[in-house]
Amino acid sequence: EQQRYLNAKKYVKLVLVADYIMYLKYGRSLTTLRTRMYDIVNIINLIFQRMNIHVALVGLEIWSNRDKIIVQSSADVTLDLFAKWRETDLLKRKSHDNAQLLTGINFNGPTAGLAYLSGICKPMYSAGIVQDHNKVHHLVAIAMAHEMGHNLGMDHDKDTCTCGARSCVMAGTLSCEPSYLFSDCSRRGHRAFLIKDMPQCILEKPLRTDVVSPPVCGNYFVEVGEECDCGSPATCRDTCCDAATCKLRQGAQCAEGLCCDQCRFKGAGTECRAAKDECDMADLCTGRSAECTDRFQRNGQPCQNNNGYCYNGTCPIMRDQCIALFGPNAAVSQDACFQFNLQGNHYGYCRKEQNTKIACEPQDVKCGRLYCFPSSPATKNPCNIHYSPNDEDKGMVLPGTKCADGKACSNGRCVDVT
């Protein structure tokens, strides 16, 4: 499974935000600024393609009236404010994997940008900020690719790191001879991060209707108006696709997809994806499409020897969640521990409404904070929780988890399984 994950194409669904100073800097022209932002993302996509990562612009926001955070010269303060705004505002409006702020402000010192290491897919940490430090857009694009590299688990290159050029993307300082290449160290760091964290959001391919940048034939994304996109005519190896037009060649039904074989749809009933577990189903081709639609067992079907119920293709049970948080010997705490969820304090609650924490009703206590017993010799406390103010949702009982016979958690309530 690990190898399958590593080999899979990755997609970063990006929202790019420009602050008010950027709007003023480009003459209050939304068209001029948008064009610059599109050009930057096209370069970033080109840079990451060598890593089997495609960057799709799914949102573009220009703060043309006023800034939505206080953008200041202290890069770490601005990053913290931008990341909090992304989590509490942007994510609620627009589904995406990563957000970058392009600012016209001068950061203190030699800093051209800042981002959280290994933050991708995390609500609070999948963010970066970049100064529009050069008129040449591809130099700004390299700086933004550098910050996204941090989000994807890459650290700064050391002197021993090589990429075959004078300077690599993850060099610690800006170079007058930058390249689009990642070093051997960056590749190792990224791979180690993928193995450790296995971020799931970057496996989801964006729909062509999600991409907001103008279609570019040759960027490996099938966008509105295109039937296929296999890269430039020089690099395309796809016999089904005409790289010059991004249209299917004569007689071809498809160019890619699990139900596409040698430019033709696979026959109806052909298995295209095996069932992963008891809550999944084997997926079959329809004979009319190249897509392999992911199907799973109905929600509420008993699983794991009746210890749980299927929920969106998974079988969430509390013990597995405790193991994920506290290690292989962890167990679910006794029922008395869950009474702390009646308090409605900063960690013991069932749900949040307008950022206010709502205490659990007595029948819902198993749908709030998860209480675990780590089972290590040093542990005396029978009621352990995972709580981080930066990611308050982590450590809550997952939706769909069995909370009583015939009942599962939904929005912090223990409701009948239907």
Swiss-Prot record:
Record's subunit section: Homodimer; disulfide-linked.
EC number of this enzyme: 3.4.24.-
Organism domain of life: Eukaryota
Family label: Belongs to the venom metalloproteinase (M12B) family. P-III subfamily. P-IIIc sub-subfamily.
Residues that coordinate or bind Zn(2+): H146, H150, H156
Keyword Chloroplast: no
Catalytic residue list: E147
Co-factor binding details: Binds 1 zinc ion per subunit.
InterPro entries: ADAM_Cys-rich (IPR006586), Disintegrin_CS (IPR018358), Disintegrin_dom (IPR001762), Disintegrin_dom_sf (IPR036436), MetalloPept_cat_dom_sf (IPR024079), Peptidase_M12B (IPR001590), Reprolysin_adamalysin (IPR034027)
General function of this protein: Snake venom zinc metalloprotease that induces apoptosis in vascular endothelial cells (VEC), without degrading the extracellular matrix (it cannot cleave collagen) or inhibiting adhesion of VEC. Has also fibrinogenolytic and hemorrhagic activities.
Keyword Zinc annotated: yes
Domain Peptidase M12B: from-to ranges: 10-206
CDD domains: ZnMc_adamalysin_II_like (cd04269)
Localization per record: Secreted
Pfam families per UniProt: ADAM_CR, Disintegrin, Reprolysin
The protein's enzyme class: hydrolase
Keywords: Apoptosis, Calcium, Cell adhesion impairing toxin, Disulfide bond, Fibrinogenolytic toxin, Glycoprotein, Hemorrhagic toxin, Hemostasis impairing toxin, Hydrolase, Metal-binding, Metalloprotease, Protease, Secreted, Toxin, Zinc
PROSITE patterns the UniProt entry points to: ADAM_MEPRO (PS50215), DISINTEGRIN_1 (PS00427), DISINTEGRIN_2 (PS50214), ZINC_PROTEASE (PS00142)
Positions bound to Ca(2+) 2: D280, M281, D283, D294, R295
Name of the protein in its database record: Zinc metalloproteinase-disintegrin-like batroxstatin-2
Binding site for Ca(2+) 1: V216, N219, F221, E223, E226, D229
Cofactor: Zn(2+)
Gene Ontology biological process terms in this record: apoptotic process; proteolysis
Span of the annotated motif D/ECD-tripeptide: 278-280
Segments forming domain Disintegrin: 214-299
Gene Ontology CC entries for this record: extracellular region; plasma membrane
